[in-house]
Amino acid sequence: MKRDIISVYDMKDDLEDIIELSIKLKKDRTIKFSEKKILAMIFEKPSTRTRNSLEVAMEQLNGHAIYLNPNDMQIGRGETIADTARVLSRFVDIISYRAFNHDDVVELARHATVPVLNALDNLEHPMQIVADFMTVYEKKHRLKGLKLAYIGDGNNMANSLLLGSSILGVDISIACPKGFEPNKEILRQAREISLKTGNKIEITDDPRIAVEASDIIYTDVWVSMGEENERENKERIFMPYQVNEDLTENANRDYIFMHCLPAHRGLEVTAGVIDGIHSVVFDEAENRIYSEKGIIYKLLS
């Protein structure tokens, strides 16, 4: 039976196993598919890390990745997502989809007969979460009991971090302006999981409260792709949520700073923080390769 990863929630039973597999694949690059596998990558949004890491991941696994831009496909001229899913399922072994609309990813997965990966949409960014917590484990040598502070917009990254933290037993405190909180249904799912794993979940509008005694500080862009018309207003609202040297004084001395990138220095984070000794953002970016290898190998082997 085929398995999709549309949400971090889809990994609630084996996220830790996937992280362990990703670390193993990073250490041993001789592990590959015995038969060539093909990935179709549909990108409605631009990409640096996701596209290139998926291509490298497939190459290292004895596979191949095909880049598909909707403007070059019949889907851009009115062909349905359902028909696109059915056709691609005859051609390839697995599909990744970076979409503006979460419902479109769900629709593709519903009609595809091969696994579908959410490569980022307006609600979640599940593959990033595997890379993130893989990186945390490499740096901290544990996950359960750590505290992660997320500062900024309650966007797709905040949603996915909520779920990932709850599954792995990582305490999470999210600081965002009122009206920009994470998705309510995802927060409900995270709280439900936390009843089993025991992690603490906090939503606040005070970044200092969130960062207090944290092991990980995470931020993301304030203006997501497709929200460019909101830039001026959001930058004004979010400036008090900038991760800067003053704010990080409230964290543990050995905290690590994370960002899924691309970053805007001087907005959500200062250059001093993202380019400083606590930053692990480029290790985090590199681990996109190995985390995606782990996910794909898990689904196809």
Curated annotation (Swiss-Prot):
It catalyses: carbamoyl phosphate + L-ornithine = L-citrulline + phosphate + H(+). Signal peptide: none annotated. Its EC number is 2.1.3.3. Its main location: cytoplasm. The keyword Glycoprotein does not apply. It comes from the Archaea. One of its GO terms (molecular function) is ornithine carbamoyltransferase activity. Gene3D superfamilies: Aspartate/ornithine carbamoyltransferase (3.40.50.1370). PROSITE patterns: CARBAMOYLTRANSFERASE. The keyword Amino-acid biosynthesis applies. Keywords: Amino-acid biosynthesis, Arginine biosynthesis, Cytoplasm, Transferase. L-ornithine binds at residues 156, 220, 224-225. Pathway: Amino-acid biosynthesis; L-arginine biosynthesis; L-arginine from L-ornithine and carbamoyl phosphate: step 1/3. InterPro entries: Asp/Orn_carbamoyltranf_P-bd, Asp/Orn_carbamoylTrfase, Asp/Orn_carbamoylTrfase_sf, Asp_carbamoyltransf_Asp/Orn-bd, Orn/put_carbamltrans, OTCase_ArgI. It is found in: Cytoplasm. Belongs to the aspartate/ornithine carbamoyltransferase superfamily. OTCase family. HAMAP family: OTCase (MF_01109). This is Ornithine carbamoyltransferase. It comes from Picrophilus torridus (strain ATCC 700027 / DSM 9790 / JCM 10055 / NBRC 100828 / KAW 2/3). The lineage of its organism: Archaea, Methanobacteriati, Thermoplasmatota, Thermoplasmata, Thermoplasmatales. The gene is argF.
